[in-house]
Amino acid sequence: MSTADKSLSGWAPAKVNLYLHVGPPKPNGRHDLESLVMFSGSGAADHLTAEPAEGLSLSVAGPFAAAAGAGDDNLVLQAARALQAASGTQQGARLSLKKWLPVAAGIGGGSSDAATALRLLTKLWALDPNHAIALAPGLGGDVPVALAGQPSLMRGEGERVTPLPALPPVYAVLVNPGVPCPTGPVFRDHDAAGGGAGFAEIDPPPEFSGPKAFAAWLGQQRNDLESPAIARVPEIGAVLEFLRAQPGVLLARMSGSGATCFALCEALAFAERATAVIAHDAHKAHWWTAASRLGAAP
């Protein structure tokens, strides 16, 4: 059976910014960035299915379906329409998204959904993969790295992606305090404070003997948006304080523009223990959390 006669499905994992250096605002209002990115496993991911149809449609289910929406502003539909336009295809698809990742949370959920849509539809419609690669930057800064799906160094406005396959896989716990953190205001606060004045690209990471050496090197880096995000959403600070107090944690930091934070752990058992502690704490019952291996996208 050809791909045109069957449905395809794939995971859209969380994107974790292990560090994020942000330059000053450019004339276009955007910023040059440098970030080391890894992806969660299927235990911390959305799931997308695409099947042949006459037109394009999207349905969304799952705990964060209402926040994501299924309208024209959903990046999955935007990606599908952009791919139709770029390729000239008249084919359609029925898209079904299970939304397990929190929205506007600093882990690139919408961008990962869009990248997965591009991958699935490229196969379903039997298109040249270069169409998806070319249009990805126009969908958002995180879409190119999500489309690559590999541990990568992300530079420029997100369009310069360098895979780093030699990085050791690590284990992490992801935690979101259940409070939205607005990306635009966080960047504006960063800019108003003179952030990015000394921005310069650093050398790519060296080879590491293991997770501890990797975490030690990451500890010399930073997330430039962490302080302005905490100023707007103090709960982020509470999450980081909690994570840093857990056994087996090598590094705790915010991802992206927040509010999701992560802790790299010596082993998966430590990450799972942290999720269990949260699950049994009534004061943290509204926190979203997941334990996962970080590496290439599933």
From Swiss-Prot:
Residue pairs linked by disulfide bridges in the UniProt entry: none
Catalytic reactions of this protein: 4-CDP-2-C-methyl-D-erythritol + ATP = 4-CDP-2-C-methyl-D-erythritol 2-phosphate + ADP + H(+)
Keyword Metal-binding: no
UniProt-annotated binding residues for ATP: P102, V103, A104, A105, G106, I107, G108, G109, G110, S111, S112
Record GO biological process: isopentenyl diphosphate biosynthetic process, methylerythritol 4-phosphate pathway; terpenoid biosynthetic process
UniProt-listed InterPro entries: GHMP_kinase_C_dom (IPR013750), GHMP_kinase_C_sf (IPR036554), GHMP_kinase_N_dom (IPR006204), IspE (IPR004424), Ribosomal_Su5_D2-typ_SF (IPR020568), Ribsml_uS5_D2-typ_fold_subgr (IPR014721)
Assigned EC number: 2.7.1.148
GO molecular function: 4-(cytidine 5'-diphospho)-2-C-methyl-D-erythritol kinase activity; ATP binding
Keyword field contains tRNA processing: no
Active site: K15, D142
Pathway the protein contributes to: Isoprenoid biosynthesis; isopentenyl diphosphate biosynthesis via DXP pathway; isopentenyl diphosphate from 1-deoxy-D-xylulose 5-phosphate: step 3/6
Keywords noted in UniProt: ATP-binding, Isoprene biosynthesis, Kinase, Nucleotide-binding, Transferase
Coiled coil: none
Family: Belongs to the GHMP kinase family. IspE subfamily.
Function, in words: Catalyzes the phosphorylation of the position 2 hydroxy group of 4-diphosphocytidyl-2C-methyl-D-erythritol.
Name of this chain's protein: 4-diphosphocytidyl-2-C-methyl-D-erythritol kinase
Organism whose genome encodes this protein: Hyphomonas neptunium (strain ATCC 15444)
